[in-house]
Curated annotation (Swiss-Prot):
Function description: Component of the FTS/Hook/FHIP complex (FHF complex). The FHF complex may function to promote vesicle trafficking and/or fusion via the homotypic vesicular protein sorting complex (the HOPS complex). FHF complex promotes the distribution of AP-4 complex to the perinuclear area of the cell. Required for spermatid differentiation. Probably involved in the positioning of the microtubules of the manchette and the flagellum in relation to the membrane skeleton.
UniProt cross-references to PANTHER family, sorted A to Z: HOOK PROTEINS (PTHR18947), PROTEIN HOOK HOMOLOG 1 (PTHR18947:SF36)
Designated name of the protein: Protein Hook homolog 1
Signal peptide start and end residues: none
Annotated segments matching region Disordered: 481-512
The species this protein was found in: Homo sapiens (Human)
A Pfam match: HOOK
CDD domains: HkD_Hook1 (cd22225)
One Gene Ontology MF term: microtubule binding
Modification sites for N-acetylmethionine: M1
């Protein structure tokens, strides 16, 4: 009997098998033949399904779908697909594609070469088995036909072998690669044994079917022969007849056929047992194949981990070198940190600007228009803050002036009260003398004339001239002194106020810049901590971002440090001018004190002369009537001065109320800005992932009003009190 063998399955080429594999993705564009794939649209859609994060919508939109017969557009699309695959291998997988695997794009687009197209599809297959969804893609490959599976497995093996040859040598990697090669060889052997067993089983099945057919035919022939035997029983008794001879001959054939049947039954049983053994071996080989596939997947995963670890180790070495450089740079900044720590109490104002700038930098890529509006708002608020601080400084200076004026007016009031008391005493004395004089005038009018003439004659003319001349000189000296000294003092005070304003502006700017330096140093420390924590686990992109952030913060820190040095130089330049002004004011104050002492000495002499004159007049005639016009003039002057004092007191109260209202407005504005600042800080802390800050470097910051009070107190200590000049 001839054994019929099944025809061998034709081995599909690489391009056709990979096209069958591409059809499992169910892309929008067709991928049935080579010409449909040369447009590059179907391959781009397959790459988008393989890794949508890398081959995103923006990358897919660059692939033109309306291609037609334009080979240039096809070449552009296929070139973009190849560039995307190369970047995916190099940047995401960290692998180098060997030159043997890179296809010729001109052959694909112009000639529709299936060999070059198969190389390109082989690279897409490598992307699928190395991406995050590789288990799903491997399961899809296992559902294909066996011939397609065999071609796909050989393509994967070729791709992995060429990748292994192009990768740099390493001891640990070499061992894993050897294990991977051994696993792949065992997998190939198992697949070959599986194929042989399958063919052998098919051959045995064919033999069993042929034997079964032969058995059935023999059984039917046996039945026919039995029927003929029953019909010819009567003729078989005579052995000399032809029928008997045929009967004996048929009986011999029947015995031979029975023996052959028994032999075939035994062979069938043997084949059945052998088939069962082969099925058991097939099941064992399938289990072994599954184990080898799992081992191959594990080795592939280990290879991926090795590649990732190799890339991360290289990046970690680079990061360690950069961290060492940054450590050296940070060690150079210790002196600056010490200076900044001493001035941290006055650096809270700059935090508003830094927080707003950080928020604007975070939202810059998302909303450019919002960034511009926020910048304008921050600038307006900064201008308002500076204007309000300047206004508060000016109001503090005005309040100080009003207080000095108030003190001068109080001194003038006390002096006027003393003069009023003395004038009251003299007025009472004059009233008494006037009553006596009236009584004397009623008795004798002529006596008064004689007394007046007598008093005028008795009163020496020299004393009168001395009194008048001293009064005139006293008034002229006071007017000259008040005019010149007041003008000079006002000029010096204006210069001093201008210097103080400049000093305050520079101090505020210095405070803001130092706050910015502190914030930038805090950010640098956070970045350094994050670099130290990540170490070898950090990816290339995160390390590059951290480097860029650190470089940007270092540049900002150097710029702010240069601005701070410039402002400190300006403050040092202004300091000697202030010292000179203070010396001039001290000299003028000493001169004023000398002149006040001279004036007091002249007033004492004048009072002494007046007392002597009064005593002389009293000794001459106690009933003499003094001039009542001078008393009325003094009363009018006293009333005018009291009215002026009341007006000044009312103006001082109004100024105090205005100052109080402005302070309330400033405090309300500050509370509102502080609330916005807290909200910004909370959002920044939430978005930053709770970055830890150096608690030792931070000191409790003063509020806005406390800072303004501190500035006014220091300014008040620096300012010079000018003594009020006494007026007539």
């Amino acid at each position: 009997m001839e054994e019929t063998q099944p025809p061998p399955q034709p081995k599909l080429p690489l391009c056709d098998s990979l096209m069958i594999w591409l059809q499992t993705f169910n892309t929008a564009s067709p991928c049935q033949d080579v010409k449909q794939l040369t447009s590059g649209v179907a391959m781009a859609q397959v790459l988008h399904q393989i890794d949508a994060a890398w081959f995103n919508e923006s990358w897919l939109s660059r692939i033109k779908e309306d291609v037609g017969d334009n080979w240039r557009i096809k070449a552009s699309n296929v070139k973009k697909v190849l560039q995307g695959i190369m970047s995916y291998y190099h940047e995401f997988l960290g692998q180098q594609i060997s030159e043997a695997l890179i296809p010729d794009l001109n052959q694909i687009t112009e000639c529709s070469d299936p060999v070059e197209l198969g190389r390109l599809l082989q690279l897409i297959l490598g992307c699928a088995i190395n991406c995050e969804k590789k288990q799903e893609h491997i399961q899809n490959i296992m559902t294909l036909e066996e011939s397609v599976q065999h071609v796909v497995m050989t393509a994967i093996q070729e791709l992995m072998s060429k990748e292994i040859l192009s990768s740099p040598p390493n001891d640990a990697v070499g061992e894993l690669e050897q294990q991977l090669k051994r696993a792949l060889e065992e997998l190939q052997e198992a697949l070959a044994e599986k194929e042989e067993l399958r063919q052998r089983c098919e051959e045995l099945d064919m033999q069993v079917t042929t034997l079964q057919d032969e058995k059935n035919s023999l059984v039917s022939e046996n039945e026919m022969m039995n029927e003929k035997l029953d019909q010819l029983d009567g003729s078989f008794d005579d052995p000399n007849t032809v029928v008997a001879k045929k009967y004996f001959h048929a009986q011999l054939q029947l015995e031979q056929l029975q023996e052959e049947n028994f032999r075939l039954e035994a062979a069938k049983d043997d084949y059945r047992v052998h088939c069962e053994e082969l099925e058991k071996q097939l099941i064992e080989f399938q289990h072994r194949n599954d184990e080898l596939t799992s081992l191959a997947e594990e080795t592939r995963a280990l290879k991926d981990e090795i590649d990732v670890l190799r890339a991360t180790s290289d990046k970690a070495n680079k990061l360690e070198s950069t961290v060492e450089i940054y450590r050296q740079k940070l060690q150079d900044l210790n002196d600056l940190r010490k200076q900044v720590k001493t001035l941290q109490e006055t650096n809270m104002m700059y935090m508003h600007n830094t927080v707003s700038l950080e928020e604007e930098l975070k939202k810059a890529n998302a909303a450019r228009t919002q960034l511009e509006t926020y910048k304008r708002q921050v600038q307006d608020l900064h201008v308002k803050l500076s204007s309000e601080s300047k206004r508060a400084d000016t109001l503090a200076f005005e309040m100080k002036r009003l207080e000095e004026k108030h003190e001068a007016l109080l001194k003038e009031k006390e002096r006027l009260i003393e003069q009023r008391d003395t004038l009251k005493e003299t007025n009472e004395e004059l009233r008494c003398s006037q009553v006596q004089q009236d009584h004397l005038n009623q008795t004798d009018a002529s006596a008064t004339k004689s007394y007046e003439n007598l008093a005028a004659e008795i009163m020496p003319v020299e004393y009168r001239e001395v009194f008048i001349r001293l009064q005139h000189e006293n008034k002229m000296l006071r007017l000259q002194q008040e005019g010149s000294e007041n003008e000079r003092i006002e000029e010096l005070q204006e210069q001093l106020e201008q210097k103080h304003r400049k000093m305050n502006e520079l101090e505020t700017e210095q405070r803001l810049s130092k706050e910015r330096i502190r914030e930038l140093q805090q950010q640098i420390e956070d970045l350094q901590k994050s670099l130290q924590e990540q170490g070898s686990k950090s990816e290339g992109e995160s390390s590059s971002k951290l480097k860029q952030k650190l470089e940007a913060h270092m540049e900002k820190l150097t710029e702010v440090h240069e601005e701070l040095q410039k402002k400190q130089e300006l403050i040092e330049d202004l300091q000697p001018d202030i010292n000179q002004n203070v010396q001039k004011i001290n000299e003028l104050e000493a001169a004023l004190q000398k002149k006040d002492e001279d004036m007091k000495a002249m007033e004492e002499r004048y009072k002494m002369y007046l007392e002597k004159a009064r005593n002389v007049i009293k000794t001459l005639d106690p009933k003499l009537n003094p001039a009542s016009a001078e008393i009325m003039l003094l009363r009018k002057q006293l009333a005018e001065k009291e009215r002026r004092i009341e007006i000044l007191e009312s103006e001082c109260k109004v100024a105090k109320f205005r100052d109080y209202e402005e302070k309330l407005i400033v405090s309300a504005w500050y509370n509102k800005s502080l609330a916005f600042q807290k909200l910004g800080m909370e959002s920044r802390l939430v978005s930053g992932g709770g970055a830890c800050s150096d608690t030792g470097a931070c000191t409790p910051a003063r509020s806005f009003l406390a800072q303004q009070r501190h500035i006014t107190n220091t300014r008040r200590n620096l300012s010079v009190k000018v003594p009020a000049t006494t007026s007539d």
